[in-house]
């Protein structure tokens, strides 16, 4: 898996829009008294705090592989919440009552096998819940891939970006959990964000999907790629007096082990 460098400040510019799927996800985890809760790919832990507030008697652990993100963990986290460096691929689900992952598994090519592993490991009555972006066919990502594979950029960026095959449908994820003895609630939602400012879609993807490109190109060449990419985005997502409409599909799966 390619290592991605994260910029907490850039990622956090749309924190309100990014937090809503997390809240929608965990609202479907219908348990009142878990003892141990894990948040995988927690970033700075600002959303992990929600889990600590919801389950004040649980030990809530947030894990993220980005030192930059973990270093930005809020100083006022609930006392039952910790945020630490940890790799999703080496996470051991043993002993956890709730395992949550929000907008992280799409970065892990082997995440399907990890889901199988966690599902086998979790005890009866435990919960496994995740959300992944399902917008890899959207113009924001399709145009990025097309530009990266163009003659000008292919030599440096060919194969850097993931395609739609990186995540599954709600049905496929539901079937996967059912095979491991889970009762499943799976769905998809398209959030239509109204973004303000100049080139807001570029500003959004700078914090997530564009990171692999920026890491490869570096400060010398990234601005030229962004210039070409932003021209394409303005046509695909025209600005209006009320803002720029940015549809964003997300895929959710929540399961309780019987």
Show which residues each predicted segment covers.
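A short SAM/SAH-binding and catalytic strip from SAM-dependent methyltransferases
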Residues: 98-111, 134
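Conserved Class I S-adenosyl-L-methionine
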Residues: 3, 44-46, 164-258
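A short acidic, Gly/Pro-enriched loop at the edge of an enzyme's catalytic core
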Residues: 89-99
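Conserved class I S-adenosyl-L-methionine
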Residues: 1-33, 38, 46-50, 69-72, ...
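Helix-to-beta-strand junctions that scaffold the AdoMet/dcAdoMet cofactor pocket
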Residues: 108-109, 122-124
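Class I SAM-dependent methyltransferase SAM/SAH-binding core
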Residues: 36-40, 44-91
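Short glycine-centered segments of the SAM/dcSAM-binding site in methyltransferase folds
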Residues: 36, 126-127
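Conserved catalytic/acceptor-binding region of the Class I
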Residues: 112, 127-196
């Amino acid at each position: 898996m390619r290592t991605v460098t994260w910029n907490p400040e850039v990622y956090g510019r749309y924190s309100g829009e990014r937090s809503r799927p997390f809240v929608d996800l965990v609202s479907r985890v219908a348990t009142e008294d878990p003892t141990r809760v894990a948040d995988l790919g927690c970033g700075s832990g600002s959303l992990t705090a929600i889990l600590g507030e919801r389950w004040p008697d649980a030990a809530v652990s947030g894990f993220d592989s980005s030192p930059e993100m973990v270093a930005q963990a809020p100083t006022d986290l609930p006392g039952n919440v910790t945020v630490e460096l940890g790799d999703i691929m080496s996470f051991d689900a043993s002993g956890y009552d709730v395992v949550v992952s929000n907008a992280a598994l799409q970065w892990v090519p082997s995440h399907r096998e990890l889901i199988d592993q966690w599902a086998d490991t979790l005890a009866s009555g435990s919960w496994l819940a995740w959300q992944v972006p399902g917008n890899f066919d959207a113009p924001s990502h399709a145009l990025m891939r097309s530009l990266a594979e163009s003659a000008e950029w292919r030599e440096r960026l060919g194969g850097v970006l993931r395609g739609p095959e990186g995540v599954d449908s709600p049905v496929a994820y539901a079937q996967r959990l059912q095979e491991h003895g889970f009762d499943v609630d799976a769905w998809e939602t398209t959030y239509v964000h109204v973004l303000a400012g100049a080139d807001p879609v570029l500003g959004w993807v700078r914090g997530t999907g564009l990171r692999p490109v920026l890491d490869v190109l570096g400060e010398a060449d990234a601005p030229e790629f962004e210039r070409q990419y932003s021209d394409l985005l303005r046509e695909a997502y025209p600005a209006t007096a009320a803002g720029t409409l940015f549809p964003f599909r997300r895929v959710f799966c929540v399961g309780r082990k019987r």
